[in-house]
Amino acid sequence: MLFTQLIILLTVTSQALSVTISDLNNIASNQVTKRLGGGSRGGSSSGSRGGSSSGSSSGSSSGSRGGSSSGSSSSGSRGGGSGSSSSSGSRNWGSNQYHCSGNSCGYGNYYAPSTAAAAVGYGTGRYTGGTQYGNNQYHCSGSTCGYGNYFAPSAAAAAAGYGSARYYAQHHNSTSSESETISGSSSLNIPSTHFYLIGFAAAYSIVL
């Protein structure tokens, strides 16, 4: 009689545990799905950052990040062709190519970072000093971006083509877009039959 009662008690307990584990599985699955967002997290970031560099523009248009930038500033107007120097000092640079110094970028006459850089043609194709990067492709250093001659973060980066599509591809594994999709669910996956076996084993050991 006692053995029969023990078997009944353990069977009921096993069924209750089975229901509880099933509920835990469902709860865990829902929680993981909520945390992962259940779908796409991300997107694409494609498009060109920049544009053509033609037209009349000049000055130290700081904050500009490429584009067909035009306008005027305190350094005067340089109508689209000859970028001859008319303002101050030996550090002035006179080409009409987009270039930057520090956090300021612009077309036309613009200060080179040093007298030596201006003397050897800062902003022209022949400038190769230091870590200067000299083609007319959109590129960035730190948080500042621009066309034309611009300082690469290192000599190695300049030599590897810093700012070019191949450089970006080598360092980002993608040239135009990045996306990330994370979805799914998880559960404890504990079979309820295990609890029946555990219950009967416990009952058998008690009887013995």
From Swiss-Prot:
Annotated Gly residues bias? 36-53
Q: Where is the lipid attached (GPI-anchor amidated serine)?
A: S185
The way it spans or sits in the membrane comes to:
Lipid-anchor; GPI-anchor
Which residues are assigned to the propeptide feature?
A: 186-208
Similarity remark: Belongs to the PGA37 family.
What the protein does? Predicted GPI-anchored protein which may have a role during host infection.
> Per its record, how is this protein called by name?
Predicted GPI-anchored protein 37
Source species: Candida albicans (strain SC5314 / ATCC MYA-2876) (Yeast)
